Regions:
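Charged, low-complexity surface segments at secondary-structure and domain boundaries
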Residues: 1-4, 128, 194-198
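Acidic/His-rich, divalent-metal-binding segments that scaffold phosphate/diphosphate chemistry
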Residues: 2-94
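Divalent metal-dependent catalytic cores for phosphoryl transfer on phosphate-bearing substrates
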Residues: 39-41, 50-51, 64-179
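Aromatic/hydrophobic pocket-lining residues that form π-stacking "cages" and hydrophobic walls in ligand
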Residues: 59, 140, 213
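Terminal helices and disordered tails flanking the catalytic cores of nucleotide-processing hydrolases
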Residues: 148-233
Length: 233
């Protein structure tokens, strides 16, 4: 389902909250740090500053490369950076709790209420279980989050105790999200060591993620494509 997308015509010159401003807030730094400590304790892959930074950067780049408004790119980057802070409370329902935490932080920083609402919606809808790409900002955050598959996310030091999530992430040596604005195609290109994890194992845990990525791409008036070891899937 495609939605109307705003274009970079006549953008406001009023000073607005940026990702740099958000990163400076001590609550943001502490919540991300403690959220990842909780993820480590329960055996999950990395959800700390590395993941937050990558998702913020990719989420910023998607609207920008598609020619959308500059402010949409900035809002996507802020939502991408904050999307997992709800894990500081509990992994369960972290999109909802993260959205509420972001409301408090961004409100204190003086962000416009309409922009806070956009970011809350993006954070609250970023998971494949019950999320939906409600707008371009949310779509960018979803794709950016789900495309961060990489061996560096594995926090378990013992390969003998890897679960399927660890094996699949550990097997991905290279991950790149390619945006082709001319042909309206967004491609997730992975280099996977199939001796560490099979392509079928990848699909076993990532099928629903790829479905929501396809929906997100449609909102951006694009097609989503998965490429593993130079093969289109």
């Amino acid at each position: 389902m495609a939605v109307a997308l705003s274009r970079p015509a006549g953008e406001s010159k009023v000073a607005q909250l940026t990702l740099r401003d958000v990163k400076r807030d001590p609550r943001v730094r502490t919540y991300i740090e403690k959220a990842n400590e909780q993820m480590t304790a329960i055996g999950y892959t990395e959800h700390g500053f590395r993941h937050a930074g990558i998702v913020a950067g990719v989420a910023r780049g998607i609207p920008r490369q598609l020619g959308l408004a500059r402010r949409e790119s900035e809002l996507a980057s802020i939502a991408g950076y904050l999307h997992d802070i709800g894990n500081v409370i509990n992994r369960c329902n972290h999109p909802e709790t993260g959205a509420l935490l972001s409301q408090s932080i961004l409100g204190d920083l003086g962000m416009d209420l309409s922009e806070i609402a956009v970011i809350m919606g993006a954070i609250g809808n970023h998971e494949e279980d019950n999320g939906f790409p409600i707008n371009a900002v949310t779509a960018a955050v979803i794709i950016a989050d789900k495309s961060d598959v990489h061996f560096s996310r594995v926090q378990n030091p013992n390969p003998l105790t890897f679960d399927i999530h660890d094996r699949v992430n550990h097997a991905v040596h290279k991950s790149y999200l390619r945006v082709d604005p001319e042909n309206r195609v967004i491609s997730l290109e992975l280099t996977v060591d199939t001796e560490s994890a099979s392509v079928m194992e990848y699909f076993e845990i990532f099928l629903m993620r790829m479905v929501i990525c396809r929906r997100a791409a449609e909102v951006l008036d694009c097609k989503f494509k998965l490429v593993i070891n130079d093969h289109d899937l």
